[in-house]
Amino acid sequence: MYRILLTGFLPFGGESVNPSLEAVRSIQVEFPNVELIRLEVPTIFGEAERMVIEQVSFCRPHAVLCTGLASGRTDVSIERVAINVDDARIPDTAGQQPLDVPIQPHGPAAYFSTLPIKSIAQAILS
C-alpha cells in the first residue's frame, strides 16, 4: 500500500475557511493500493510541526504533501523550497508572531522538494 500524507491548515487570521484544508478534504483517491491520509493542522507555530512529525512517525507515508494559504495569491503555487525560518506576517491563532526564528536550529537553511513541481502545477492548472 502506497501511503500519502496530505496536510491542510485550519482557518486563521479572522477567516472562517482555509482553502488549503478544503482542498485536502476534497481530494478523492481512486487508485488501487493508494491510501490517502489527511491531517488537519492548527495554525500554531510549533504545534503544526509536532503534529506532522508525529503522524509521519505513526503512519510512515511514502510521500508528504503539505498545503497552505498564501494570502493574496489567485492561483495554486507549488513551492520548490521550504525555508528553515519562522517569520510571521500576522500572529498565529495562539497569538505567537515569530520573526526570523530558525525552525530547526541545526538544520540546513532550506529544504528542496524532490517532487516534479512544474508538472504538478501544470496538471492542477489544466
Please state what every model-predicted region is:
Residues 1-126:
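N-terminal catalytic or cofactor-binding beta/alpha core of small enzyme domains
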